[in-house]
């Protein structure tokens, strides 16, 4: 283990549930689209046979390094760098359809805990929030020029922040005096607009979530990979998705419903009266972390796991 691994560890969420409900073919081909520190991948490898294959994908340089280390010690595993919607390339490389795709969405504990990554409203650091800091612009860069109305829209859409307009206004007033470049500077600004008292929740929680989702194009990547999964999964292959907030979970829930022949007519982009081709079947009920897991892993509190199988 490297110093970074021990300093910023990540505890995989709902590990047993994922393996029990998602993994079935010991010689199968699996993709972990959100490798992180490989908690789910390592557990999967421990059940995978000699001819089984696993591809890990992540866009974060530290996660990629951890994956490459694993790949060097296990020939059944291969690490790919990039957004998880590079899924078709992964499948092309393997030359066979996938038996399972896992997405454990959002950020990892190492990303949140390392102040230098700029994700945390509790630790001071540069206001960045990019999962891949080599691509695109940081939150600080975006906030330096974005229109007040666009900032308010992002806070409202991705954070469900009711006072989004007030916060956006304060950001635009403040940046005339000084650039907003630090995480605590933004957290304090939001607190000065909303006040402190929010039933144990930091007032900046929703805004930080919104800015992170926006700057990383998270929901767009999710939409894309869900569509790709229909073409890349083998019949009988399973999709397992762990979401951490209602926006993500809603996208996953509607996607499964709209491809399982259960969409109300006129929904899911289909003309009224059209029959839906059934391509996915939900597996079991929506799952949440067990009481035992909640006690030892606070991150599992908001986790929601959905599994679906490709049936046609
Ligand atoms: C919750 S963590 C996954 C943790 C992992 N299951 C484990 O047990 O270590 C999410 C990971 O997915 C990555 N990620 C999130 N969205 C991504 C995307 N669109 N493309 C590629 N990686 C993404 C993040 O960089 C992060 O490392």
Curated annotation (Swiss-Prot):
Disulfide bonds: none annotated. Specifically methylates the N4 position of cytidine in position 1402 (C1402) of 16S rRNA. GO terms for biological process: rRNA base methylation. Signal peptide: none annotated. S-adenosyl-L-methionine binds at residues 38-40, 58, 84, 104, 111. It is found in: Cytoplasm. It comes from Alcanivorax borkumensis (strain ATCC 700651 / DSM 11573 / NCIMB 13689 / SK2). The keyword S-adenosyl-L-methionine applies. InterPro entries: RsmH (IPR002903), SAM-dep_MeTrfase_MraW_recog (IPR023397), SAM-dependent_MTases_sf (IPR029063). This is Ribosomal RNA small subunit methyltransferase H. The keyword Cytoplasm applies. It comes from the Bacteria. Belongs to the methyltransferase superfamily. RsmH family. SUPFAM superfamilies: Putative methyltransferase TM0872, insert domain, S-adenosyl-L-methionine-dependent methyltransferases. It catalyses: cytidine(1402) in 16S rRNA + S-adenosyl-L-methionine = N(4)-methylcytidine(1402) in 16S rRNA + S-adenosyl-L-homocysteine + H(+). Keywords: Cytoplasm, Methyltransferase, rRNA processing, S-adenosyl-L-methionine, Transferase. It is an enzyme of class 2 (transferase). The gene is rsmH. HAMAP family: 16SrRNA_methyltr_H. GO terms for molecular function: rRNA (cytosine-N4-)-methyltransferase activity. Its EC number is 2.1.1.199. PANTHER family: 12S RRNA N4-METHYLCYTIDINE METHYLTRANSFERASE (PTHR11265:SF0), S-ADENOSYL-METHYLTRANSFERASE MRAW (PTHR11265). One of its GO terms (cellular component) is cytoplasm.
